[in-house]
């Protein structure tokens, strides 16, 4: 699909950057010569817009060997960022998709500034081409054929091999994020814990990873009472899924991802209202993020060791379901008083974290649609984070900045730990109250990470969006897929 060329050569469409500067860039000046000065006129008449995310279409009318040019407004160079570029290109690729364009090129060097080099632009362009044109996988009987871009060419004077490599990495990041989106959007009668495990196994086999899928009896033998308690009310069997990627000769410095895999959450006996229950098919967004990251890792083969653990079940009501006031024993041996059956994700993750440590994880990052509290605190654009290790958190933060997936650190104080340890009947309680809800959930998980360096990512607000946006339609976003993968790719770098 991707090609790299030094010059334009008969493309259907070429994408060109337009900055809000007094002078046209050298690339636009060269084009303007072919247009006999008419581009300058269009700029002066505001027919070509330099505003951020503005898309202006110009027909060549035979003046060049390209049929149409799409000029992408990027605003002022001084405020130009990777986020600006992602948003603008996302809109551009959507426009091409609507126009059913099959052969497009990007004048890569026109997007390059002191802040962003050609490799950065190539990576983002290929990534966004996939993200921006993603379409919901529906179950409608009258499915329409998807329009795909068949050929995409980067026009640049830079080294073709390096640019092609950046295009490939960007494409892999975008495609894997879309894989996660599709998982999150799947209905709960289709994506059960069993089906999620089957998907994970197929992924592992495709990329020659080791894997384990623990069944209920094996979980009982290992004492995974927290996950098993959540599963008590279900007719669907639980699964503890583990994918193991060995990127080094020695099994050291193992990064452990733990993704919440609750395939549907009614709240259990602490029953959600109807408004709160609709959409809970997406409560396995953390599992999807982890699997998306493992897809990228499988494709790119970084020299790191990585474990992905997914505790999976649904949380439903029945005569056998666990109840408020129950006391359960986790795999770690710590006992937990259940005060809220709708705080089930942290119970599943508790055993997932302990199991990841048992498999050899030296560093832990858990990802979960964990609390409504994080949405109240940070909104729908920023992922909440907590940690017991600032050095590991800084690496996660840098990865999130590179991928434009913002995170914000929330605190863990000793008084927070006291609140999750204040049960009269057990070592911990799973729901100390609504105050500081997001912090309480993360603090609870920290009790199981213990001294292992750990970062918690609460994607309850960022995993899905209600409306279409520059990088895709309403629905699942694939939050944290690219951040997790980038963390692995950059892990340990100074």
From Swiss-Prot:
Binding site for Mn(2+) 2: 260, 265, 283, 344
Known EC number: 3.4.11.1, 3.4.11.10
Catalytic activity annotation: Release of an N-terminal amino acid, Xaa-|-Yaa-, in which Xaa is preferably Leu, but may be other amino acids including Pro although not Arg or Lys, and Yaa may be Pro. Amino acid amides and methyl esters are also readily hydrolyzed, but rates on arylamides are exceedingly low; Release of an N-terminal amino acid, preferentially leucine, but not glutamic or aspartic acids
Known cofactor(s): Mn(2+)
Bilayer-crossing regions: none
InterPro entries: Leucine_aapep/pepB (IPR011356), Macro_dom-like (IPR043472), Peptidase_M17_C (IPR000819), Peptidase_M17_leu_NH2_pept (IPR023042), Peptidase_M17_N (IPR008283)
Compartments reported by the entry: Cytoplasm
Annotated Gene Ontology cellular component terms: cytoplasm
Cofactor binding note of this UniProt entry: Binds 2 manganese ions per subunit.
Active site per database record: 272, 346
Binding site for Mn(2+) 1: 265, 342, 344
Gene Ontology molecular function terms on file: manganese ion binding; metalloaminopeptidase activity
Swiss-Prot/TrEMBL keywords: Aminopeptidase, Cytoplasm, Hydrolase, Manganese, Metal-binding, Protease
GO-annotated biological processes: proteolysis
SUPFAM superfamilies with a match to the protein in the record: Macro domain-like, Zn-dependent exopeptidases
PANTHER family noted in UniProt: CYTOSOL AMINOPEPTIDASE (PTHR11963:SF23), LEUCINE AMINOPEPTIDASE-RELATED (PTHR11963)
Family to which the UniProt record says this protein belongs: Belongs to the peptidase M17 family.
Protein's job: Presumably involved in the processing and regular turnover of intracellular proteins. Catalyzes the removal of unsubstituted N-terminal amino acids from various peptides.
Protein name: Probable cytosol aminopeptidase
Organism whose genome encodes this protein: Bacillus cereus (strain G9842)
Lineage: Bacteria, Bacillati, Bacillota, Bacilli, Bacillales
Gene: pepA
């Amino acid at each position: 699909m991707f090609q790299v060329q030094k010059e334009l050569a008969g493309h259907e469409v070429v994408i060109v950057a337009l900055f809000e500067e007094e002078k046209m860039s050298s690339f636009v000046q060269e084009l303007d010569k072919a247009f006999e000065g008419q581009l300058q006129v269009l700029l002066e008449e505001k027919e070509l817009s330099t505003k951020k995310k503005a898309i202006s279409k110009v027909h060549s009318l035979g003046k060049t060997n390209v049929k149409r040019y799409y000029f992408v407004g990027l605003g002022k160079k001084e405020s130009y960022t990777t986020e600006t570029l992602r948003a603008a290109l996302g809109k551009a690729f959507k426009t091409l998709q609507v126009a059913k364009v099959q052969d497009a090129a990007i004048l890569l060097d026109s997007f390059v500034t002191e802040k962003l080099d050609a490799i950065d632009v190539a990576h983002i362009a290929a990534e966004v081409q996939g993200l921006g044109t993603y379409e919901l996988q529906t179950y409608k009987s009258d499915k329409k054929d998807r329009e795909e871009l068949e050929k995409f060419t980067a026009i640049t004077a830079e080294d073709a091999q390096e640019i092609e490599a950046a295009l490939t990495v960007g494409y892999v990041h975008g495609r894997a994020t879309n894989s996660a989106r599709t998982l999150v959007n799947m209905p709960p009668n289709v994506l059960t814990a069993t089906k999620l495990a089957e998907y994970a196994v197929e992924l592992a086999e495709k990329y020659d990873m080791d894997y384990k899928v623990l069944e209920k009896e094996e979980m009982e033998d290992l004492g995974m009472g927290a996950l098993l308690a959540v599963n008590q009310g279900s007719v669907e069997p639980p699964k503890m899924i583990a994918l193991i990627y060995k990127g080094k000769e020695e099994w050291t410095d193992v990064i452990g991802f733990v993704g919440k895999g609750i395939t549907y959450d009614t709240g259990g006996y602490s029953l959600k209202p109807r408004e709160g229950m609709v959409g809970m098919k997406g409560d396995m967004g953390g599992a999807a993020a982890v699997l998306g990251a493992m897809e990228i890792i499988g494709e790119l083969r970084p020299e790191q060791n990585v474990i992905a653990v997914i505790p999976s079940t649904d949380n439903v009501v029945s005569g056998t379901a666990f109840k408020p006031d129950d006391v359960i024993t986790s795999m770690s041996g710590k006992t937990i008083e259940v005060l809220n059956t709708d705080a089930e994700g942290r119970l599943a993750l508790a055993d997932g974290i302990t199991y990841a440590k048992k498999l050899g994880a030296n560093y832990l990052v858990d990802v979960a649609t964990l609390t409504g509290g994080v949405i109240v605190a940070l909104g729908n654009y920023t992922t909440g984070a907590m940690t017991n290790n600032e050095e590991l958190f800084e690496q996660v933060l840098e990865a999130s900045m590179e991928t434009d997936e913002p995170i914000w650190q929330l605190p863990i104080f000793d008084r927070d730990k006291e609140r999750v340890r204040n049960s009269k009947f057990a070592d911990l309680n799973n729901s100390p109250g609504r105050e500081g809800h997001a912090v309480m959930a993360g603090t609870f998980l920290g009790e199981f990470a213990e001294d292992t360096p750990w970062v918690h990512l609460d994607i309850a607000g960022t995993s899905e969006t209600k409306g279409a946006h520059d990088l895709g339609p309403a629905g699942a976003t694939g939050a944290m897929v690219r951040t997790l993968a980038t963390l692995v790719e950059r892990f340990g770098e100074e």
